[in-house]
């Protein structure tokens, strides 16, 4: 039986946050290695998230601090919907995550104390679980998955879509 994994990152919510990006759970590269303060959300090498964000905002993002500064500048928060999971087949796929505990208390606190106006999900999986947990929250929508496995859109198309939705 695979071990239970706990999310390694706290939500990042700048005081000026009006937008929340909500993912599922970090890949095993983030959770099954030694703790490292330089690691952060979407740290898997193949994941396109930071490449997309870098292109959207026309800036280089070399480290966690660069990413946090960019999100602070544009009022973007980030967290994940799952807090603890067990992986099936040691897989990073959302569908292979057995949910042990949702991150719903942190998300509820974020929505209750901040001025979040928009939530963007990075997968349909996240959207499904968020809508089940927070059925009354309506100002939320799906962004194309930054996973390279999501091949319905090219990276350039994802960049343009994110650019049309995220704060300027």
Placement of each model-derived feature along the sequence:
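A structural micro-motif
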Residues: 76, 117, 137-138
């Amino acid at each position: 039986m695979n071990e239970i994994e706990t999310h390694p990152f706290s939500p990042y919510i700048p005081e000026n946050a009006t937008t929340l990006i909500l993912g599922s759970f970090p890949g095993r590269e983030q959770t099954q290695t030694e703790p490292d303060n330089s690691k952060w959300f979407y740290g898997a090498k193949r994941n396109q998230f930071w490449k997309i964000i870098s292109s959207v905002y026309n800036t280089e993002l070399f480290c966690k601090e660069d990413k946090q500064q960019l999100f602070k500048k544009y009022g973007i928060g980030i967290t994940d919907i799952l807090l603890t999971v067990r992986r099936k087949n040691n897989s990073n796929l959302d569908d292979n995550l057995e949910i042990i505990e949702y991150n719903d208390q942190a998300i509820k606190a974020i929505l209750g104390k901040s001025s979040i106006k928009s939530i963007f999900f990075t997968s349909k999986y996240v959207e499904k679980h968020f809508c089940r947990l927070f059925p009354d929250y309506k100002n939320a929508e799906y962004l194309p998955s930054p996973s390279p496995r999501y091949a319905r859109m090219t990276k350039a198309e994802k960049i343009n879509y994110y650019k049309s939705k995220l704060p300027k």
